[in-house]
């Protein structure tokens, strides 16, 4: 995998930094594992904007990725690595011995021809999925379940991983990248290793149009608006003279947003401040 800085042949190319992976498949994706993906433009079923700064962008198909990894005891061979426009990580197309193909998240170091397996008896190596009670303490894992059988929810983006730091009875304690320490049932599954494509964070889009290709619209500062549009709007100069708030007057920048008290008991230590 290489980091390529483009030559300044035009203003739009001057700052572009690309991540080039020659191992990625250059053809079309595997059609039976594709689904139609409609654009919402950030609107809900009433046509109201529920998420700002979304709209346009290139058409995409959704890749049906197997986050459950529940095909136990059947070895699979990695056929190829592919780009997935719906996530920062790359995905791998695997062929199981019984003839079924599935997409999985491509962990670091996985390449075409490698063999992977799921289940209690799987070997301790990157790409294999086991219940966390069978994974040694200190291991780094990704695609971690929070409820047994629900499928992986933690550590799924490029370069992400979670470390198993303790095992106590029916629970394991995980250290997340944010610094949070959290308890999860030991029967929950996780995939060994960390997610590949960690260089994704080094890319530079280089121009506004590259964001538009991805369906991201401009974000206008509140202080650049009029008073009718935003609490920070209007006035002489750039000072808005109050605590930062959202367009609807709710405090931002540091305000706590977590409201799921039911699972507070599973958080051993809160995430560390940056």
Curated annotation (Swiss-Prot):
Residues 221-274 are annotated as: Disordered. One of its GO terms (molecular function) is structural constituent of ribosome. Pfam families: Ribosomal_L2, Ribosomal_L2_C. Keywords: Ribonucleoprotein, Ribosomal protein, RNA-binding, rRNA-binding. InterPro entries: NA-bd_OB-fold, Rib_uL2_dom2, Ribosomal_uL2, Ribosomal_uL2_bac/org-type, Ribosomal_uL2_C, Ribosomal_uL2_CS, Ribosomal_uL2_dom3, Ribosomal_uL2_RNA-bd_dom. GO terms for cellular component: large ribosomal subunit. GO terms for biological process: cytoplasmic translation. Belongs to the universal ribosomal protein uL2 family. Part of the 50S ribosomal subunit. Forms a bridge to the 30S subunit in the 70S ribosome. One of the primary rRNA binding proteins. Required for association of the 30S and 50S subunits to form the 70S ribosome, for tRNA binding and peptide bond formation. It has been suggested to have peptidyltransferase activity; this is somewhat controversial. Makes several contacts with the 16S rRNA in the 70S ribosome. PANTHER family: LARGE RIBOSOMAL SUBUNIT PROTEIN UL2M, RIBOSOMAL PROTEIN L2. This is Large ribosomal subunit protein uL2. It comes from Yersinia enterocolitica serotype O:8 / biotype 1B (strain NCTC 13174 / 8081).
